[in-house]
Design a protein with these regions (language model features):
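Residue-level detector of Asp-centered blade-edge/turn motifs that repeat once per structural unit
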Residues: 23-25, 67-70, 107-109, 163-164
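Conserved beta-propeller blade signature
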Residues: 27-30, 72-74, 112-114, 167-169
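Loop-centered beta-sheet repeat module
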Residues: 128-186
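A short helix->beta-strand "capping" segment at the edge of beta-propeller domains
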Residues: 1-16
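Asp-box/WD-like beta-propeller blade repeats and closely related beta-sheet repeat scaffolds
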Residues: 60-63, 76-126, 136-152
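Signature of short aromatic-glycine-proline-rich micro-motifs recurring in repeat-based ectodomains
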Residues: 13-20, 60-64, 154-160
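Short loop/turn segments that connect beta-strands within beta-propeller blades
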Residues: 40-44, 86-91, 131-135, 181-185
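Short coil/turn segments at the loop-to-beta-strand junctions that recur within blades
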Residues: 11-13, 49-58, 97-104, 143-148, ...
Length: 199
């Protein structure tokens, strides 16, 4: 059942362009480039995380985020090439420097899945599985197609869809294939035939 939830606005609660929405059992989370806003499922404002800056406990921007099982907020700053984990009390718990220019993230078991699009990297892959404990990439998937990388620069904000704690769907703009990604594999879930017009 779909439910329409109206979120409040005021002079002290003005959300910029929304780039991501996540929901949990009890809360709705909305982010723009600088803050993550938390609301109840009924739309009542709870709090916001705003740590934008250049200090040791701050992030430069929010490119993507998710909320883990412990209600910790993970923030990706593509500009800084870093991941930040903040507690439910907005305290920085961890930061991880990345070797790739990630633009989207998704939790996958005890790891984090990174999507880099067609940005070339040492592995020349689009998906990278980051080990949270060590802060290192332990596996990469889906080779970058060099010809597509020359012209296909359109970025979509919604490349991941969670299936379970250990599996998610992955799809790209202008791509005819939807993949299932697990911590140890990637497989084709669906392929669409556009009658000869596939890119």
């Amino acid at each position: 059942k779909n439910t329409l939830v109206l979120l409040p606005t005021s002079d002290s609660l003005l959300i910029n362009e929304i780039n991501r929405i996540h929901s949990s059992t009890n809360h709705i989370y909305v982010s723009d480039v600088s803050s993550v806003y938390q609301f109840t499922r009924d739309g009542e404002f709870v709090k916001k995380l705003n740590k934008q800056g250049e200090g040791p406990n701050e992030y430069l921007n929010i490119s993507d985020f998710f909320v883990d099982k412990g209600d910790n907020i993970w923030i990706l700053s593509r500009t800084a090439k870093k991941l930040y984990q903040y507690s439910a009390d907005n305290e920085l718990l961890k930061s991880i420097s990345l070797d790739v220019w990630a633009q989207n993230i998704s939790p996958l078991g005890n790891d984090i899945l990174l999507y880099t699009g067609n940005e070339t990297n040492s592995a020349n892959m689009q998906l990278h599985l980051l080990d949270i404990a060590t802060g290192t990439i332990k596996k990469s998937y889906k080779a970058i197609k060099e010809k597509q990388a020359e012209y296909l620069h359109v970025k979509g904000n919604n490349v991941f869809r969670k299936i379970s704690d250990k599996e998610c769907c992955f799809s790209q703009l202008f791509n005819d294939t939807i993949y299932n990604v697990a911590s140890d594999s990637i497989s084709v879930a669906h392929t669409f035939d556009w009658d000869g017009h596939n890119i």
